[in-house]
């Protein structure tokens, strides 16, 4: 049952922590399970690169209400490792599936409702990156393909997402994806290659397959700046653009 004061599942939270973490870390309950979550865990572990404390990972907590509460969520770890550098949030309806793989998440990474993270090899998502609802991050094709020349390529690869990335809703990141810092991926895009050759401070990727459509764009991550910009447009309804000051910060 749900513990009414904090609205998390006490029993599932205890099971996950003491199955995945050393005892001295598990007693802090760094992983908190919310909502209607199915647990499938075997021979797996979580490694903390930060000090253990309550609620570093909030799994299936509905914080933006793109999905109803409780939407079914899945935490599946078999022979898997999750490395955590700081706070991470998975909203309701998310699937986290690590099977013979390593998933490393930077500080303040956030997955909105319905996201699927499928890791069979290696996925590394750096700090402050955010995934909008219904995104898929998958480092495997699951099945092998026999080519005309008789060769068969490996079906697994790696995915690397840089710092402060914003992945639009319903986007798919497949094996081979490498995104630099301050990247925006437009909604419903499909990405499966490296964009690390771009040295501009911010790129915008869109389409299927994903292509760079604009350089120099960055998501405004600062909540304070977003409030200022929103207030400006509410007051100046006839104005289409807001001009940033020279000392403007995209994130804080």
Walk through the language-model features, giving the residues of each.
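Short helix-loop boundary/capping segments
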Residues: 137, 142-148
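Extended serine/threonine-enriched, polar tracts that run as long, contiguous segments within proteins
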Residues: 167, 173-176
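Domain-scale signature associated with acetyltransferase and cell-envelope carbohydrate enzymes
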Residues: 1-138, 162-164, 171, 181, ...
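A generic "structured core" feature
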Residues: 174, 180, 184-186, 190
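Flexible glycine-rich beta->alpha loop in the catalytic core of nucleotide-sugar glycosyltransferases
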Residues: 143, 189-190, 196-197
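Glycine-rich NAD(P)-binding loop of Rossmann-like domains
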Residues: 150-161
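Short acidic, glycine/proline-rich loop/turn micro-motifs
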Residues: 147-150, 217
């Amino acid at each position: 049952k749900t513990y009414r004061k904090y609205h998390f599942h006490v029993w599932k939270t205890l099971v996950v922590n003491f199955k995945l973490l050393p005892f001295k870390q598990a007693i802090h309950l760094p992983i908190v399970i919310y909502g209607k979550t199915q647990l499938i865990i075997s021979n797996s572990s979580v490694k903390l690169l930060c000090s253990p404390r309550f609620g570093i990972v909030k799994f299936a907590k509905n914080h933006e209400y793109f999905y109803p509460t409780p939407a079914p969520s899945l935490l599946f770890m078999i022979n898997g490792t999750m490395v955590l550098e700081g706070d991470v949030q998975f909203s309701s309806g998310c699937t986290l599936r690590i099977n013979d793989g390593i998933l490393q998440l930077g500080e303040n990474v956030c997955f909105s409702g319905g996201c699927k993270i499928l890791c069979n090899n290696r996925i590394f998502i750096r700090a402050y990156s955010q995934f909008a609802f219904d995104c898929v991050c998958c480092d495997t094709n699951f099945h092998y393909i026999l080519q005309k020349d008789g060769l068969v390529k490996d079906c697994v690869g790696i995915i690397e997402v840089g710092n402060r990335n914003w992945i639009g809703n319903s986007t798919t990141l497949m094996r081979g994806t490498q995104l630099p810092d301050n990247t925006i991926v437009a909604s419903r895009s499909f990405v499966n290659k490296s964009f690390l050759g771009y040295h501009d401070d911010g790129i915008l990727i869109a389409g299927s397959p994903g292509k760079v459509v604009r350089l120099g764009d960055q998501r405004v991550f600062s909540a304070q700046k977003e409030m200022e910009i929103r207030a400006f447009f509410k007051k100046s309804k006839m104005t289409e653009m807001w001009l940033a000051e020279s000392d403007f910060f995209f994130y804080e």
